[in-house]
């Protein structure tokens, strides 16, 4: 499979398919620092990034906001002193789409 960071998000409509269990197992291996959470019956990807202070956490949040706008796919973001919690899921399908894995990989790339 092509590296997730090289892929672009595709438009995700309400009738788009969620990832299958087999796809989930394959894709999650490509983003090993991410976990799967279920909230209100909706599967989501989540990762907590640690930083030395609030300023660095906020700078990361701003870079992530720019990426989200470029890809037109937006995460849940909780910015706190020394950490940023990022949650990806596709609102229109109430679950996980390949776009979420692409964006998780691209989020990790922001640390480079």
From Swiss-Prot:
Top-level EC class as recorded in UniProt: lyase
Domain of life: Bacteria
A molecular function GO annotation: 4-alpha-hydroxytetrahydrobiopterin dehydratase activity
Catalyzed reactions per annotation: (4aS,6R)-4a-hydroxy-L-erythro-5,6,7,8-tetrahydrobiopterin = (6R)-L-erythro-6,7-dihydrobiopterin + H2O
Pfam families: Pterin_4a (PF01329)
Keywords: Lyase
Record family assignment: Belongs to the pterin-4-alpha-carbinolamine dehydratase family.
Protein name: Putative pterin-4-alpha-carbinolamine dehydratase
